[in-house]
């Protein structure tokens, strides 16, 4: 009945939608950034959540301050969700911030990203001084930070993530989330991400 209703409305059937999401999930996971993936959680988790975000995006900061901590605690740390973070710099300032995040010790990457979002309103007013201070606390010296922001290959690699996400996956703004290949609009409602994860876990019988 659902399939007939969907057909009458010109919509894909539930089976088609599930197949499309699975195909997209596979394509997304194969689109590993040239400078390496950054992920948290169990690679064998039943749900993979991919976020495309910009370091200067207020909605991204809101998500990381208000929603992400509970998702991390309730899903990622319990082995239910693999969280993949992909840089989608919407301006040169965001690009520079992400370059610096990639230059800190790898085990400090997510702590750096969290601090960038937490302090977004402050460092965007005086970017170089505040960002250099921030990454300095993560173990990156001022001289290494200076060298980092001149790495053309790193800049090109980060921008390629944005280009591919835009061209192949229809990512237009930030934050954009994919949960097992299903697109969620975190820009309008950050809390919808949690609902999307719950729906996917319920579908898999693992809630």
Task: Identify the meaning behind each predicted range.
Residues 2-89, 202-207:
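Extracytoplasmic thiol/disulfide redox context detector
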Residues 18-21, 54, 134-207:
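C-terminal cap of thioredoxin/glutaredoxin-like
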Residues 3-4, 116, 149, 197:
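A general structural motif at alpha-helix termini
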Residues 53-56, 61-136:
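Structural alpha/beta surface segment adjacent to cysteine/selenocysteine redox centers
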Residues 34-35, 118, 179:
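Residue-level signal for pocket-adjacent positions within structured domains
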Residues 36, 96, 145:
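Glycine-rich, flexible loop/turn motifs
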Residues 40-47, 95, 107, 126-129, ...:
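Residues at secondary-structure transition points
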């Amino acid at each position: 009945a659902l399939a007939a209703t969907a057909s009458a409305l010109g919509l894909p059937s539930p089976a088609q939608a599930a197949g499309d999401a699975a195909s997209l999930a596979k394509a997304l996971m194969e689109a590993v950034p040239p400078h390496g993936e950054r992920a948290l959680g169990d690679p064998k988790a039943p749900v993979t959540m991919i976020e495309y975000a910009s370091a200067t995006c207020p909605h991204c900061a809101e998500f990381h301050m208000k929603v992400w901590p509970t998702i991390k605690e309730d899903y990622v740390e319990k082995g239910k969700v693999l969280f993949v973070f992909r840089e989608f710099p919407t301006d040169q300032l965001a690009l520079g911030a992400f370059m610096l995040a990639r230059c800190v010790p790898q085990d400090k990457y997510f702590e750096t990203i969290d601090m960038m979002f937490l302090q977004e309103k402050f460092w965007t007013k005086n970017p170089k001084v505040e960002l250099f201070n921030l990454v300095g606390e993560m173990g990156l010296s001022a001289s290494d930070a200076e060298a980092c922001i001149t790495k053309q290959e790193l800049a090109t690699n980060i921008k390629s993530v944005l280009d591919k996400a835009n061209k192949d996956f229809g990512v237009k703004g930030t934050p954009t989330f994919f949960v097992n290949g299903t697109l969620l609009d975190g820009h309008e409602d950050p809390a919808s991400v949690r609902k999307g994860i719950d729906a996917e876990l319920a579908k898999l019988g693992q809630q």
